[in-house]
Amino acid sequence: MKLCDFEVGLDQPFFLIAGTCVVESEQMTIDTAGRLKEICAKLNVPFIYKSSYDKANRSSGKSFRGLGMDEGLRILGEVKRQLGLPVLTDVHSIDEIEQVASVVDVLQTPAFLCRQTDFIHACARSGKPVNIKKGQFLAPHDMKNVIDKARDAAREAGLSEDRFMACERGVSFGYNNLVSDMRSLAIMRETNAPVVFDATHSVQLPGGQGTSSGGQREFVPVLARAAVATGVAGLFMETHPNPAEAKSDGPNAVPLHRMGALLETLVTLDQAVKRNPLLENDFN
């Protein structure tokens, strides 16, 4: 699959979707994107910057949601203009899609909306690549139906069906907890869509702090290594210059100063894994 200006798939090095959870300010966004660009260029990692203009799904109605759609999109547009980076952001309603698609390179659907047929259809008809997040409540094999919905809508609109990714971000395990089943990454390959692993939301503790979500960022490297060892097309990781002061999802964000070391390890592992065919393909 061609994504932005690079190829993605199990026969290609993993690509990275990374950035702050939410757009907090223009300067921090540009600085963070610039630093990530430097790191990824050094390691030859294809890179898409991500950040949200609005956090529609918050634990508390008093939580910071963002700078607003117009300002958030303007800042993401500056990332493209100043740094020459492709940009991804999530959309939350059908009404937002046209305006968002006019600015960003890749759309993302929130996990909680993966079963909303009209919403998935509308995203698919945008003409943009779409990273479709698997709901925390969904079995991995059920993602085939979700991807098929997107492909059907794209085909009916006369658009390419080869623009959709399936993203794993953990599954609910009791209250305020998520677990990652690495088998899901292999199962989701059966969609014939590139599989992306969200290593930071997978360590989230949803609502675990009462009015906000907690997280266990110390396990991000553990799960990221496991996903790369399993074999994925891409990784999704949120980061922040100072996670303790992040306005959203700080507890599961990778400290920006640690991203280089983490990615260096993951690149080495990815190269080793993709040097040979995946053994599970011959086990049935």
UniProtKB/Swiss-Prot annotation:
It catalyses: D-arabinose 5-phosphate + phosphoenolpyruvate + H2O = 3-deoxy-alpha-D-manno-2-octulosonate-8-phosphate + phosphate. It comes from the Bacteria. One of its GO terms (biological process) is keto-3-deoxy-D-manno-octulosonic acid biosynthetic process. SUPFAM superfamilies: Aldolase. Keywords: Cytoplasm, Lipopolysaccharide biosynthesis, Transferase. GO terms for cellular component: cytoplasm. InterPro entries: Aldolase_TIM, DAHP1/KDSA, KDO8P_synthase. Its EC number is 2.5.1.55. It is found in: Cytoplasm. Pathway: Carbohydrate biosynthesis; 3-deoxy-D-manno-octulosonate biosynthesis; 3-deoxy-D-manno-octulosonate from D-ribulose 5-phosphate: step 2/3; Bacterial outer membrane biogenesis; lipopolysaccharide biosynthesis. It holds the Pfam family DAHP_synth_1. GO terms for molecular function: 3-deoxy-8-phosphooctulonate synthase activity. Gene3D superfamilies: Aldolase class I (3.20.20.70). Signal peptide: none annotated. Belongs to the KdsA family. HAMAP family: KDO8P_synth. This is 2-dehydro-3-deoxyphosphooctonate aldolase. The lineage of its organism: Bacteria, Pseudomonadati, Pseudomonadota, Betaproteobacteria, Burkholderiales. The gene is kdsA.
